[in-house]
Structures are given as C-alpha cells and as structure tokens.
A protein has these predicted regions:
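Acidic, surface-exposed loops and disordered segments
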Residues: 1-190
Length: 190
C-alpha cells in the first residue's frame, strides 16, 4: 500500500494558529478536480472557507455539535457538493461516487503536503444549502476539514487528544473482499 494512504487518518487535534495558504488549497482542489468522473459529467463542486473568513464561519456554524468542538481549529473547511437529480437515478448515484473519489484524491494530496484531511458528514446540509445558495440540483454531502496537527497535544481538549490517540483500525480483508460468492474470502493466488 502506498505510504500516503497509510499516513492518512482523520485527526481532530489541529493547531489553531497554523494556516493553509490559498496556493495549498488550490493544489488540493486541483486533485479533486482531476478525480475520475462517470461519463465526464464532473458534478462535484466546492465552497472553500479559510479560517477567519465569512465562508469558514458559515461552514463552522453548520457543523453538528460533535464537530464544532474541534473543526474550527482547522485552517480550511470545504463544503463538497454533487448532483442531486431526483429524476435521474444514475446521475444521483454516480454523483455520490464522483464526490467520494474527489474527496479521496484531495485527502491524499493534502497528506502529501503535510496537511491532515478530515471529511465530515456531521453537519446541517439544509443550513449549508441556505447559507451558500446551493442550487436545488446539487446536494451538500461532505465538509472537508484541512489542518496541521498541533505540535503539543497536551494543549488540546483532552477529549480530542483521547480520540486522536486511539488506534486506526479497519476490518481485515477476509471480511470485506470476497471471491466466488459473498462471504468467501478472496485469497491471492500463490
């Protein structure tokens, strides 16, 4: 597995004084822009807030309670939206796939730059839609926090430090990758 994928994790212990430049955000957005897209429809859109600007404040206000405790320390918050075509199931479904691919590529790009990405579904999508005049044919799905980790975690909220110190775990491949039929683990040929 590539080391950037191994290094990626959704931290919360951001340095509230660290900034992310417009140039760095542009590189991260470019990674999202160049993500694979079904039928070249390119349905993903971004609303970008840098800490201290009005967009950032509106995005932070839309966060659910659990995310409001740590995400405002991020250097940037990005609302990621995609197509919401109620009359076109393919467009609706593939728009979500395209969004996931874009966020994944943005996350890996961020890690390569020493920036920690944390995608969140815990926000009020209706409030975000209203705050930013998101059109009816788009749906806000994710807010991506981007930040630099604090050098001294003892200065952070103990709940954040505790959560960030938990091991990063995933189910074993034998429980998620199958061959032949559902539940039969995939095994590499020897």
């Amino acid at each position: 597995m590539h080391e950037l994928i191994e290094e990626r994790w959704s931290a919360r212990g951001y340095d509230p004084d660290a900034t992310i430049s417009a140039e760095e955000i542009t590189d991260i957005l470019e990674a999202g822009r160049w993500a694979p897209t079904w039928g070249r429809i390119q349905p993903v859109r971004f609303i970008v807030g840098l800490r201290g600007d009005a967009t950032f404040e509106q995005l932070a206000a839309a966060l659910n309670r659990g995310n409001k405790g740590w995400a405002p320390s991020a250097g940037a918050l990005i609302l990621v939206c995609t197509s919401d075509a109620a009359d076109d199931a393919k467009l609706h479904d593939y728009g979500a796939v395209d969004l996931g691919l874009a966020v994944a590529q943005m996350s890996i790009q961020a890690v390569s730059m020493g920036i920690n990405p944390h995608p969140m579904a815990g926000f009020d999508a209706s409030a975000a839609r209203t705050a930013f005049d998101v059109p009816a044919d788009k749906r806000p799905m994710v807010i991506l926090a981007l930040g630099r980790l604090a050098d001294d975690p003892t200065l952070l909220d103990p709940d954040v430090t505790d959560r960030d110190s938990q091991p990063r775990e995933r189910l074993p491949l034998s429980e998620i990758a199958f061959a032949g039929r559902w539940g039969e683990p995939f095994t590499a040929a020897k």
